[in-house]
From Swiss-Prot:
Domain of life, source organism: Eukaryota
Lineage: Eukaryota, Metazoa, Chordata, Craniata, Vertebrata
Function in brief: Mitochondrial amino-acid transporter. Does not act as a serine transporter: not able to mediate transport of serine into mitochondria.
Membrane topology per record: Multi-pass membrane protein
GO biological process: amino acid transport; mitochondrial transmembrane transport
GO CC annotations on file: mitochondrial inner membrane; mitochondrion
Annotated family: Belongs to the sideroflexin family.
Protein name as catalogued: Sideroflexin-4
Subcellular location: Mitochondrion inner membrane
Organism for this UniProt entry: Bos taurus
Amino acid sequence: MEPNVRFWITERQSFIQRFLQWTELLDPTNLVLSIEKIEKSRQLLLTNEDASRGDLEDKRIQEAWKRSLSTVHPDNSRLIPGPFRPAALLPFTAPTLFLSMLPVKSLKSMILPQASFYTYSTAFNIVNGNASYDRRAHESLLLGAGVIVSSTFLGLFPRLLQVRLSMNSVLSRNFIPVIILAQLSGMNVIASRSLEPMRGIEVMDKEGNVIGYSRKAGTKAVKDTATSRVVLFGTSAFIPEVFAYFFKRTQFFLQNPWSLWTLKLSCTVLVMGLMVPVSFSVFPQIGRIQCNELEKEIQSATEETELFYNRGV
C-alpha cells in the first residue's frame, strides 16, 4: 500500500490532531527538499510497514513521514512539484489575495492580481486533486485554461460595476468583493476538478485494495475541498477588511495614511498563516464513506461497510 494512504487510513485523527499535523507539513523547508532525501525517506517507510507517526523514539521515522506526506501525491506516488506543494499555498496566494482586495483605481490595475490568483489556484487544485482516474495532459490543460479565464472574468465583474457605477459604499467597496472571492474560490475547485465526479475516483478498503471507481465519492471529495477553500479565502479576505474598517477611524491612521496597507498586508499573511492549516484540517485527507452510499456495482463488489478515497488538498 502507498505509505501516505496507509498513514491517513490508520491514523484516525481528530480535527486538532490534523491541525497539528498540518502545521508540520506546511513547514517551508519542505519546498526545497532534495529528491535524494525524499527517496530515502520513502524507502524507510516502505521497508517499515508497521511504522506509525506515534513512533516518538525514532526521529528518522518522524522525519520520513513529514517528508513523504508533504511532497508525494498519495494516488500515484509521484513527487508534487515544489511550487504546488501544500506548503507553497501561503507564499504564492497571500500577496495576490492582498492585491486583489485593494481599492479599484482602474480596471487594468485589477487584471493582473485577479489573473495571477486564479491561475495559481487552478493549477494547485488540479495538481493536488484526486489523480486516480484516467485523464490526459491536454484535458487538464484545456480545463485549466477555461477555469482560469472564467474565474478571472467573474472576479473582475463586480470591480467593473464599481468603476462604472461609482459604487462607494462600505458594503459594495469592501465586503461584497469578499463574498464573491470566497464563492469563486469554491467554484474554482469544483470547476478545476470537475472530471472527478464525472469519471469517478478510486475507493478502497482499509487494506488499500481498490474496489472500484465511484462518481459519488468524487462528488463528495470535490464538495468537501471546495467548502474548505471557501473557509480559507473568505476568512483571509474578510478579517483584514474588518481591521482596516476600524483602523481608518483611529488618530494614528489620520497621521500615517500609508500604514493602512502595511496593516492589511500583515493581517492577510497572519490570518492566512492560521487558516491554511485550519482549512486543510476541516476534512480528513483520506475520506471515509459508507458503502451503502455508493453505486450498486461497488456495493456488490465488497462486504466492507466503510470504504476510503483520497479527498485531495
